Amino acid sequence: MKQELFNDDWLFWYDENSFALVWNIPEQAQKITLPHDAMISETPYAESRNGNNTGFRDGKNYVYVKTFIAEEEDLYRENILKFEGSYMNTFVYVNGQLAGKHHNGYTTFYVNMKDFLHFGENEIRVQVRNGAMSNSRWYSGGGLYRDVYLLSSDLLHVSAAGSKIRTVELENDFARIEVSVPIENRKCKGIQFDLKLMVCDKDGKILLVDQRPY
């Protein structure tokens, strides 16, 4: 799965009413590059509901918008947004439709855009609600404070969450491992394929090769 940074050319502004889905872009929108901490620029004050937990700064509700061009071939591929961290409750809209949401400010999450894209210009709008205080025991930051990536692949692919490897047994120079490779098929029919697995050491030397049909 191809992965590229998706941090450039975002617009940002504060949302006064997080429950009013207004699709215009206000004049005061700022052009930013992610990662972006929307809380750090707030003026600290003694009466903050968070107190010293977040540096006497209040959280607010934020909006991020980015447009990008989808070519015709992109409509027949998986296009997934990977958010490494967004604080706090996050709602992701693609061309005005809710494509995904996430309610934990510290964990990575994915939003599949395939069913919402169209040829030409597309709009991604991320609404981050961080106005419900207090919600942290330390400085959390606010908004899209970590990297965002665009993942793209064929409709038959290894899951965006990736493979897992676990050491089952380890003794001297012998090890037995268990590898899990989740495969997703978004095609309209079943597909037969070969899965090839290579295990390498820290220097890139191939230690094990396994290939089998599915």
Predicted regions and their residues:
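Accessory carbohydrate-binding/adhesion or oligomerization-edge regions at the termini
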Residues: 1-47, 123-127
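Accessory beta-strand-rich segments of carbohydrate-active enzymes
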Residues: 4-17, 54, 58-161, 166, ...
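A generic "cationic amphipathic patch" detector
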Residues: 22-23, 33, 42, 81, ...
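Surface-exposed, low-complexity/disordered Ser/Thr/Gly/Pro/Asn-rich loops and linkers
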Residues: 47-55
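Beta-strand-rich binding/interaction modules
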Residues: 94, 174-214
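Short, solvent-exposed loop/linker segments at the N-terminal edge
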Residues: 167-175
